[in-house]
Amino acid sequence: MSVTGFTITDEKVHLYHSIEKEKTVRHIGDLCSSHSVKKIQVGICLLLVELCERFTFFEVVCNMIPFCTIKLGYHNCQAAILNLCFIGTSILTPVFVRWLTDVYLGRNKLVYICLFLHFLGTALLSVVAFPLEDFYLGTYHAVNNIPKTEQHRLFYVALLTICLGIGGVRAIVCPLGAFGLQEYGSQKTMSFFNWFYWLMNLNATIVFLGISYIQHSQAWALVLLIPFMSMLMAVITLHMIYYNLIYQSEKRCSLLTGVGVLVSALKTCHPQYCHLGRDVTSQLDHAKEKNGGCYSELHVEDTTFFLTLLPLFIFQLLYRMCIMQIPSGYYLQTMNSNLNLDGFLLPIAVMNAISSLPLLILAPFLEYFSTCLFPSKRVGSFLSTCIIAGNLFAALSVMIAGFFEIHRKHFPAVEQPLSGKVLTVSSMPCFYLILQYVLLGVAETLVNPALSVISYRFVPSNVRGTSMNFLTLFNGFGCFTGALLVKLVYLISDGNWFPNTLNKGNLESFFFFLASLTLLNVLGFCSVSQRYCNLNHFNAQNIRGSNLEETLLLHEKSLKFYGSIQEFSSSIDLWETAL
């Protein structure tokens, strides 16, 4: 063969490779374009589902105390406890639903059940909350004459079914999935959670403004809008299921496994089991199979990491009790203040919108402080400082609420219409209470992102989802602890510290007591905060060989949907991740 033949063949080979390379590049471009469109579609659907779910949830929370006290005749203490229990149950049900999804039921089947329960609850709530007075639908005259006993039963059933429905939506459709963060360090993780909570509060602000309009309008808007929002949420969720747009998280060490390890360790450390194992360096080692337990070394070491976060979670219980004063003590204080603004009756939900403003304003500043002023090695100290400062702001808010409660009772009484009844309230303008709402908003701005980053980064990546579940669990326990505290204070003080008529009691004493507990909580957290300064401490320890998965997960950059795996660039924007 001639040299010319070799040259032509070589040119053909180069031409062939060029064509194949062009096809590959075009194919990759099409995949990237398709994935970008899918990401935008997922983000829009998630925001709409979150908006509908938050609207129904906050609609119940914002109207619970006025409805229970004015319509159902509950005492202030009973209404506050019921509201706190509803919030706590709504926080805990996603953890329960995730467990059902992983163990017993399929994801799609559970989503269908939860959507039905959510719509059933909103429909029942609308029937119960329908105005008790006569009303007209066109020329048709109707009367809502549901007996009080049946009304109370339907009300509890509606609240329970809404909680179960919310659990399914939050756990499966809108989970706190910080997927794609394994490749980032502490500073980028802080940026993610800053903007994640910024988006959540923007969503909440829109919801509160919408609820404010409903509270200002007639009651029929409530009857029609809550079931409508539930139906809209169901339609969007069904669309996401049909087009495989729901993120599917990986199954890791579960909460039940962690609890089981603790129980097994306590059982096998009994003297009669001590002879079964010698290789014991900690209490949890008793739960290992080689030491007489029934759990693998992998599960035991994962649980050990959770125990290091336990003091952090416990010290957040009292902080949560302060934050939960917005839907309990602060609501009662606002209801008994003058809501009349030049003839315009200000809706109570406006105060919630005001408490959301600090995060919307301060998030960019936190972003600057965490990324520009503090090097990566000092991010842990910065996060601990944020948590301490947030707790101090919460204590200051509750203390100021106590002073304003004393001040409020010195104003002359006026009559004010609320929920169809005329109440005798203080003439102190409700704008005096803005400061305490703002301070609690600042506390949430500082604590929530910092606490989430520590919970996420302080453990290996293979158990971070379970760590976030533990954080959710303690947030729910904080609501129930707050309800228990309200009940104990009511019983011990004979109703004086949480009175049914605020002008005849001393609600300020309850606020001062809560502020004192929060300050003690700050001192306790300061004593353990140093252990959370190094967010990558587990990398320096002699961790099991199976934790080589930690390194592999740092390079795993994929979003997993039903039946599909989409690759995405490591330069993904944090705003897109939050969406």
UniProtKB/Swiss-Prot annotation:
User: What GO CC terms are in its UniProt record?
Assistant: membrane
**Keyword Transport appears in the UniProt entry:** yes
The organism's place on the tree of life at top rank = Eukaryota
InterPro entries in the cross-refs: MFS_trans_sf (IPR036259), POT_fam (IPR000109)
**Topology in the lipid bilayer:** Multi-pass membrane protein
Coarse class of the protein's main subcellular location: membrane
One Pfam family in the UniProt entry: PTR2
Task: List the keywords (alphabetical).
Answer: Membrane, Peptide transport, Protein transport, Symport, Transmembrane, Transmembrane helix, Transport
The GO terms this record gives for MF are:
symporter activity; transmembrane transporter activity
Q: Does the keyword Metal-binding apply?
A: no
Which PANTHER family does this chain map to?
OLIGOPEPTIDE TRANSPORTER-RELATED (PTHR11654)
The record's similarity note reads: Belongs to the major facilitator superfamily. Proton-dependent oligopeptide transporter (POT/PTR) (TC 2.A.17) family.
Q: What does this protein do?
A: Proton oligopeptide cotransporter.
Q: What is this protein called?
A: Solute carrier family 15 member 5
